[in-house]
């Protein structure tokens, strides 16, 4: 947290220094956002453990973009996030990278990013922490699993982006290689409080392709992910030394018209676990999920949201019966799936002041903490509900 606060001071200091030195305003730009809300998800461990209405729904951020030259740009953002038990609370360096434009002309452009960059491969992965850029307060958990947020949101490493304009429209290709450092708290959000050892992401390798047809409101895409993790147990630990491989294939589409829009993503994820639970243990499974969200402009400044989000922990065991049987019936079948119906309403008081409200009706608990250790104490119901409201301001 101290490192992130220092980065925030340096980021703000850079802006002040740049302005004091008389740099053109088009060279240095800074923006920010502040949001606060209320949320409740009874009978689950999603937000808290006492079923109460929680104010742990805070997003604050400040970002800067500094054009060092015509081809070189420095960009950074520091955020403070509080999502309750969904992910790590506190201040963090969201991104800080150099963007080097290697080539740019009328038809195509090539950029290289070095440093801590955002995940550009999914529809909302790069902006999921910026409240006014997403359709819902709580994103579809089949794809944007909150317990995995700190790993999925970005990486330290190298990335490239190529955009090409053709007679059929614009094509965008993204490639990245990097890793994310996991703190003890982040590891325990994934592995439960029983984890006393060190979890490490060895690497994450991603690629994505997007196509935006000419004179069309459509965007279609595909993305691939491959990542390895290792776990080194502590002297006194519930788990063993082990390794995991996560691989994803995703398809996505978005249609944005003047008064309505649709967005959807489909994912199949392979999880290969070696040892970890016990020496010699192996498990190889394929989960599947997808969501469809629609927004409609009901009235001036007012949008309605309808979404459906489905997830199955094992595509060959959608009912969860085999999963439950493998635990001797100790873990209910509803821990193997999670289906969500969402209704929401958004009202813009001003161009930069928005109130969003939503309600979720959920069946199953597969996307509640902890991914590798079902929480039978707090996730006690197959059917549960959640509501949230959030006021956001950006500048």
Predicted feature residues:
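Cleavable N-terminal export/targeting peptides
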Residues: 1-23
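Transmembrane beta-strand segments of Gram-negative outer membrane beta-barrel proteins
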Residues: 22-45
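Outer membrane beta-barrel
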Residues: 27, 37, 51-183, 210-214, ...
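Transmembrane beta-barrel strands of outer-membrane/channel proteins
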Residues: 32-40, 76-80, 112-116, 173-179, ...
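Surface-exposed strand-loop-strand hairpins of Gram-negative outer-membrane beta-barrel proteins
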Residues: 37-58, 188-195
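Short, solvent-exposed loop/turn and secondary-structure capping segments
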Residues: 43, 124-127, 317, 368
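Outer-membrane beta-barrel pore domains
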Residues: 48-49, 221-395
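Signature for the C-terminal beta-barrel architecture of outer-membrane proteins
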Residues: 101-102, 106-112, 148-292, 296-304
